[in-house]
């Protein structure tokens, strides 16, 4: 816009006023009248600066007057200029109604000056001036205010021109506010400013042409006198141009999507950050609420804490008391165990010594009997009184056992198969008396102790209550690993009168402590959520720590492998004990020690107790001879040990049993005795008894065509016996030999023997031949 700056106008105004005052006084005189009129108008609006306002009005009037214009035309131009500036100022800071009210008065005053050249104009009253001034101040105060009334707004160029043409609208010097920093702009102002700058840059040439045309029109309006009608049209055209320019300045440019997208993204980021902060605050508040509720519950359950404390304190006191009690009683328990063990050991040693002495005495007697030169003249032997007494006792006990078998109906029993473990009445009385005294002392151990501290079931109930009420602390205390050691003294007391070598002894699974521990474990298995496996191992641990060591002591010093009753009872109790280790992957040292003791004891029995003498054929004539009877008793005694060894099938490894039973006993003693005997039905019967003792599990494999290596000597003896027996007299015995071969899986030998000797069809057992 080609408008001249305000300072340039002022400078030219001052110069023109000075030149006019020096050169032409008449022109100044004619110009002062309209100027004074304009000055009075401004003076009414601003009473405190009336004189300066009138001076400025004269300067404006003189500077805009054309030199060649007539006085009347100059006056009209000056009036229109003053009125135009007044209209622009009022249009910017006042309402439309005020401007409409003042415009007719201004037009009428101007027309009167043109027609009558009268200096009289309408002066607004003080209230109107004060209200207009107040509105201007309020309009200037909010920097981001944009009026929505287009009639009251103006374009940027019009506002600038209004300010340039009407410097009197500026506040006085003492009312001006000095700005040291740029006034902050609002977002709408910045957008409008950027929009106007881009529009000015894009249409710079057209804007300059338009501004030039406007400036020329203004200059022509100043220089040429325009009639009233034309002035009105010009005023309307100026207003329409102003409105048009206003519309152009406030209209928004085409939308830039990148800027909008960026602003939306920024706004979205701010909202998301705000949402996250609110979410964090919300979570914090929720956590505070939870902690508050927990605190409330803790405070409300303060009584439960008191009860828990009393329970733990009572449990601690209970455990301390039971430990003190057991520490005090363990000395008496050990003494009683030692007394009972000593009593049983003395009895076992006495029986073993008696058997060995009787064996030596009888063997010596038979040796003397075989020597003809040692006999006396009347044919009797010179026997020591002691040996004679031993022989009489041996024969008396045999008579008693024979009578007992006849009463029981066991007529097929062989001499030597029974256990010679009978005691004399005096010895039995003394033994039972000592055993009763020990058991009586055992009852007095916990006589002064409450059942809650000496009864296994009551103790486990206490710990079961702990496990049910506070399982976490129960399992954290590893109670399941401590209970076996805690219960061990009490179980040892119950095992004090338990003899695993007696058939009538109570089984382990029938004992009260066994039942109580089993129930405790079953209740633990019901609590699946908290079960850690320690309670399931309590019974196995108790047996491993308490029962197995006691079994080991019995095996090492008291057990007699030649006793079938003791061996059967011992194997039954060992199977019950070993069943508890079936699910355990770890190897128990106590169990291995027990198995080693069993093997060692059987080896010792084979070496010390087995003796089968070989007499000359002449000494064995007749089955009723002393030599023949003694040899038969010793053979059947060895066969009984062979059978007792094989009773450990399933408890001891197969290779160990085969080495003991077959290698050390069958091949070394039994086969030699059979080879020295005369072939016949008795030999076949003994072979059948040997085959009956062999475990069937060793021959379950249907693909086997040959027997186990340790039975090779036995199979050869069977074939030799079958060859010596004639088919006509011993047909049944040969068939029995074939059945024995089939049982021990010597199928090839059985088939060859059957082909050599055509016999009757074999029973169902030999269908595999």
Curated annotation (Swiss-Prot):
Signal sequence extent: none
UniProt cross-references to Pfam families, sorted A to Z: GCFC
Phosphoserine modified-residue sites: 16-17, 19, 85, 118, 169, 203, 206
Biased composition (Basic and acidic residues): 190-201
Cell location: Nucleus, Nucleoplasm; Nucleus, Nucleolus
Ranges in coiled-coil conformation: 256-308
Family, per entry: Belongs to the GCF family.
Subunit relationships: Found in the Intron Large (IL) complex, a post-mRNA release spliceosomal complex containing the excised intron, U2, U5 and U6 snRNPs, and splicing factors. Interacts with TFIP11 and DHX15.
Protein name per its UniProtKB record: Intron Large complex component GCFC2
